């Protein structure tokens, strides 16, 4: 982890255990885990490369936005809200209640994305973030996009937030969220702490002194694989 952190611009952290199904065969688990790991990236990577005019959003989230967002420890999540099919007899104009329902679907998808992050973290620790709304064109409006931005800002008040929309989805309203430049990730801190404890034990057995210091001060003591 330290070696990758020092060399890479950003590292996506994914906890496989979050996707493990109890009593499922190992091979089935691995296939399901891999599928769930890559799923949130699909809309994110397609939105900025879309060539069909009818699928280009009002605010495009392209590779430049993604690159500007990614830094250091990074976590991704995705949430979905089903949308009812709109047939020939469906209303063309939405009233206030329809718009409220659509906004609540967006909020639900955002909450699910933050609840299904690839690794448990505190959103308030993020320095950068982005969200992408993917939905049928008729399910999108500026109220939803603004509501999503307000919700994410409330959860990640210290983050510089980028956003975009992708009017391509057919049967659901999807929200993809990235939290990046995380200044504290408990699981990573635990790994580094255990590594330093092991180094301390080894030095003690060798008769070497190893003073007690803060984690930030002892980070350099962890060897790298470079």
Predicted regions, residues:
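Tubulin/FtsZ superfamily GTPase core signature
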Residues: 1-226
